[in-house]
């Protein structure tokens, strides 16, 4: 368009349009050098990059204009609109410049425009769906392409022999076979452009799209073999040449796949060591993938197959190694390049069709080619599908076969190949070019416009893409293992057997070699779900100011909700309560209004809940990392501090943990720490009392202090933040060390004020008399308490705390309650328990002295009888730990040192 605008301006020469080079200023009459020019037009120096940028800009603006109307894009595919736009632009250029200026050059197409599209297709291809249908894809790609090429070429040659093609079309059998090889291949660019807008089901899409990618090897081999035979002449072709042609099919296809896998291995291995240079990770992905394409093209192998296998093989390991920002950059950059290249290709196809000097028309050849490619495509799909359905578990029905036959689109690959023909060797090149343009336009425009109504009319199953839930993934993996086990049992090495063997090999060798160790946590799907749930919970927690605020939490229970000072005075309160007391005027308190008090309470809540960042970040510029902005750093710090405070608050409230930063004080000489084991010498022969919650062995929780936190490194990127690490250790090990960490002290825990009764205590008053129950946990479960299991561990402790009764190391001194009501006046006589060695549960005697009436006691008897089997210790192995020196007990203290 820039050239068109420049051509309309008189006096401005344009390079490449018939204009000469930039005129040089001649010296003056006396031979003096020219003076300093204030302005010089240097178009020839920036012509190439400027035109590239201009074409991409025009293509992007065209896509924006097309999508302004949803009705237009829903009826007409985007590829059709781009071809029509190219025809319009080409006509304008031809009318102004009197000749076609731009064409789709084969070198530009194969080296610059095609690689981004194929890389995007291979990198984001669903690998599981691709390998599940690999047999059908290879059948349609290899057998189907060979069938279409030979049948189309032979049929066109027969059409010429029958006299339906003009005699001026000078072509023999080898020429028609060459034309059939380039016109029979399904184009991946056209298939992607049309089928992504139709949204057919996943199986149908992956078969057609996989065929368009993998048939490149067959197309390249057939094109090169037939072109070589044409150059040699039919009289000079030997039998060994045919054998070489068959062998080259395997060399080109397998060689291209091998090149792609080698570069995929190198790419995955390289990204394993980019932890400290994250900024170059997206660059490595594109460079090595493009190097795979160029290497295969240099060795005359299948470049499309090479870059497809490179993207398909490296994605799993690259996604695990690179950072989240790099993954986002790779995704959007790859999609942008592919979309831009596809847009430019279809526009250039439309512009190239305007130049009538490059093609010649023959109606018989054009119509015959259109009929034969449609007929033999449908016939080949029906025959191959009938064979495949004999072995497929889910057969392809007739509707799928109709869509596959109608979806064989041709595109820019066929046009680029026909342009590469040598006119001296192939005299009918101009007729082949015209026929190819008509076939491409017919398949992209006519079939692209009608395939969506056809799919709706046939009621083809559409794709319902959604991210599988954890339950679906679990069942899918379960079925895979079951089917692999069945094949292993019957001795049949089928698809599931080999897939299971590959997964074991990948887990044992490839993942260990190509992934860094920190990537294994990312691969864990359960951990990923847990992490996302935790992040969502934390975000909602931070949004509430760090506290779970509610309407009840915004006011104090003792604060009256008043509106003025007069309503909140002491006299007014006494008057409302009906008190007869007379207060002196000097002692009447001046109470602020309820709104002022609510504002004060809200101020304290916000000051205690909101967190002001303490870290000072210096502005830095790094070549290896993308530094976070101030808001990102502040949000991250607020999130970490709120989560840490929340965990500390939860631990201290639930399990009576006391965190202190002072140094441990020396213990007095006569002071003895309470143990959870009954010592006969200390009790002087008296029966030991029940073990309480305060008397069990303590678990030392190592928590990072604030001073250590403030001295952390202020690097711009610190990704692996493990948070708080709780370390459970035995009391004996801590006491043997002789000292405790400076951030924690061991001290006796004072009694705390009992909280308000819960619902269970209101319904079952005997529970409130138990005090702090000792929770015993098996030693096997408390030796290792992972950080990611803290939540389940705490819930288990809470369950034991609410259900379990206090175990006894010796026979208890309390008796089982009788079924009849208790009499408060009768004294409790200790019962000799020597005859009953079993440990049993007994309701505390405080209930008998509570002063309850007989009716209240009788009402609680059914509840006690229902709960009595639950609270009795029939199995001592689960709740009673036995001797304390061989078991691990846990105690959380509040308000004191552990």
Swiss-Prot record:
Annotated region (Disordered), positions in chain: 660-692, 801-888
Extracellular topological domain: 25-47, 97-136, 197-202, 270-278, 355-362, 422-430
Catalyzed reactions: Na(+)(in) + H(+)(out) = Na(+)(out) + H(+)(in)
Tissue specificity as recorded in UniProt: Highly expressed in brain. Strongly expressed in the dentate gyrus.
Organism of origin: Rattus norvegicus
Sugar-modified residues: 201
Main location: membrane
GO molecular function, one term: sodium:proton antiporter activity
GO-annotated cellular components: dendritic spine membrane; focal adhesion; neuron spine; plasma membrane; postsynaptic membrane; recycling endosome membrane; synapse
Protein name in the entry: Sodium/hydrogen exchanger 5
Tree of life domain: Eukaryota
Cytoplasmic side: 1-3, 69-75, 158-175, 224-248, 300-333, 384-400, 452-898
Subunit structure: Interacts with CHP1 and CHP2. Interacts with ARRB2; facilitates the endocytosis of SLC9A5 from the plasma membrane. Interacts with RACK1; this interaction positively regulates SLC9A5 activity and promotes SLC9A5 localization to focal adhesions. Interacts with SCAMP2; this interaction regulates SLC9A5 cell-surface targeting and SLC9A5 activity.
TM regions (residue ranges): 4-24, 48-68, 76-96, 137-157, 176-196, 203-223, 249-269, 279-299, 334-354, 363-383, 401-421, 431-451
Bias (Polar residues): 856-867
Biological process per Gene Ontology, one example term: regulation of intracellular pH
Cited Gene3D superfamilies: 6.10.140.1330
Keyword Ion transport among record annotations: yes
Pfam families xrefs: Na_H_Exchanger
């Amino acid at each position: 368009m820039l050239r068109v605008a420049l051509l309309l301006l008189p006096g401005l020469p344009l390079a490449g349009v018939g204009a000469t080079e930039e005129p040089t200023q001649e010296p003056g009459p006396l031979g003096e050098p020219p003076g300093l020019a204030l302005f010089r037009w240097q178009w020839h120096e920036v012509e190439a990059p400027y035109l590239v940028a201009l074409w991409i800009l025009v293509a992007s603006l065209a896509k924006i204009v097309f999508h302004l109307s949803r009705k237009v894009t829903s009826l007409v595919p985007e590829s059709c609109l781009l071809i029509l736009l190219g025809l319009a632009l080409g006509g304008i250029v031809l009318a102004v410049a009197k000749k076609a200026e731009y064409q789709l050059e084969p070198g530009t197409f194969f080296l610059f425009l095609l690689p981004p599209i194929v890389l995007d297709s291979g990198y984001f291809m669903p690998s599981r769906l691709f390998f599940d249908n690999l047999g059908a894809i290879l059948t349609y790609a290899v057998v189907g392409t060979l069938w279409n090429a030979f049948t189309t070429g032979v049929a066109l040659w027969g059409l010429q022999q029958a006299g339906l093609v003009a005699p001026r079309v000078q072509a023999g059998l080898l020429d028609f076979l060459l034309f059939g090889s380039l016109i029979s291949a399904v184009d991946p660019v056209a298939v992607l452009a049309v089928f992504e807008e139709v949204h057919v089901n996943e199986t149908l899409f992956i078969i057609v799209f996989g065929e368009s990618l993998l048939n490149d090897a067959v197309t390249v081999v057939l094109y090169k073999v037939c072109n070589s035979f044409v150059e040699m002449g039919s009289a000079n072709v030997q039998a060994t040449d045919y054998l070489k042609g068959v062998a080259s099919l395997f060399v080109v296809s397998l060689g291209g796949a091998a090149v792609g896998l080698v570069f995929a291995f190198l790419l995955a291995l390289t990204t394993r060591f980019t932890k400290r240079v994250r900024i170059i990770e997206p660059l490595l992905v594109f460079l090595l993938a493009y190097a795979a394409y160029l290497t295969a093209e240099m060795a005359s192998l299948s470049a499309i197959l090479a870059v497809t296998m490179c993207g398909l093989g490296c994605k799993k390991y690259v996604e695990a190694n690179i950072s989240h920002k790099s993954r986002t950059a790779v995704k959007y950059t790859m999609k942008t390049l592919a979309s831009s290249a596809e847009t430019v290709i279809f526009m250039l196809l439309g512009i190239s069709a305007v130049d009538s000097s490059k093609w010649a028309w023959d109606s018989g050849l054009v119509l015959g080619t259109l009929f034969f490619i449609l007929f033999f495509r449908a016939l080949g799909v029906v025959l191959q599908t009938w064979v495949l359905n004999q072995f497929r578990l889910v057969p392809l029905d007739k509707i799928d076969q109709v869509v596959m036959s109608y979806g064989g689109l041709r595109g820019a690959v066929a046009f680029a190949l026909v342009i590469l023909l040598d006119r001296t060797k192939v005299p009918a090149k101009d007729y082949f070019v015209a026929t190819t343009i008509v076939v491409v336009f017919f398949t992209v425009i006519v079939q692209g416009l009608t395939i969506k109504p056809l799919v709706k009319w046939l009621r083809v199953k559409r794709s319902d893409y959604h991210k599988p839930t954890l339950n679906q993934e679990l069942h899918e993996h379960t079925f895979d293992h079951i089917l692999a086990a069945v094949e292993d049992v019957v001795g049949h090495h089928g698809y599931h057997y080999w897939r299971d063997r590959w997964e074991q090999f990948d887990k044992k060798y490839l993942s260990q070699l190509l992934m860094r160790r920190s990537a294994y946590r990312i691969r864990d799907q359960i951990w990923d779900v847990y992490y996302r749930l935790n992040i969502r919970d934390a975000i909602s927690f931070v949004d509430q100011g760090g506290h779970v605020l509610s309407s009840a939490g915004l006011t104090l229970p003792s604060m009256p909700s008043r509106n003025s000072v007069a309503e909140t005075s002491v006299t007014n309160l006494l008057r409302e309560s009906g008190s007869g007391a007379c207060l002196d005027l000097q002692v009447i308190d001046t109470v602020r209004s309820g709104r002022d008090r609510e504002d004060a309470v809200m101020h304290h809540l916000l000051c205690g809940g909101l967190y002001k960042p303490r870290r000072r970040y210096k502005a830095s510029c790094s070549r290896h990392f993308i530094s976070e902005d101030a808001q990102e750093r502040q949000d991250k710090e607020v999130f970490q501090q709120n989560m840490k405070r929340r965990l500390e608050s939860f631990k201290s409230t639930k399990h009576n943990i006391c965190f202190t930063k002072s140094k441990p004080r020396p213990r007095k000489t006569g002071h003895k720490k309470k143990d959870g084991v009954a010592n006969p010498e200390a009790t002087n022969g008296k029966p030991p009392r029940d073990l309480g919650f305060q008397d069990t062995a303590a678990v030392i929780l190592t928590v990072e202090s604030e001073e250590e936190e403030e001295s952390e490194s202020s690097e711009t990127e610190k990704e692996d933040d493990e948070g708080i690490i709780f370390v459970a250790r035995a009391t004996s090990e801590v006491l043997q060390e002789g000292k405790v960490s400076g951030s924690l002290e061991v001290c006796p825990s004072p009694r705390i004020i009992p909280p308000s009764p819960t619902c269970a205590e209101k319904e079952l008053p005997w529970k409130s008399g138990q005090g702090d129950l000792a929770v015993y946990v098996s030693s096997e479960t408390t030796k290792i308490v992972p950080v990611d299991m803290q939540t389940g561990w705490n819930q288990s402790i809470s369950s034991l705390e609410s259900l379990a009764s206090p175990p006894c190391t010796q026979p208890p001194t309390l008796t089982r309650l009788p079924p009849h009501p208790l009499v408060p006046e009768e004294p409790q006589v200790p019962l000799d328990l020597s005859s009953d060695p079993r440990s049993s549960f007994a309701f505390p005697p405080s209930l008998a002295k509570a002063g309850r009436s007989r009716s209240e006691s009788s009402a609680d008897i059914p509840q006690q009888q229902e709960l009595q089997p639950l609270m009795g210790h029939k199995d001592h192995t689960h709740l009673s730990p036995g001797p304390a020196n061989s078991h691990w007990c846990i105690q959380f203290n509040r308000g004191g040192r552990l």
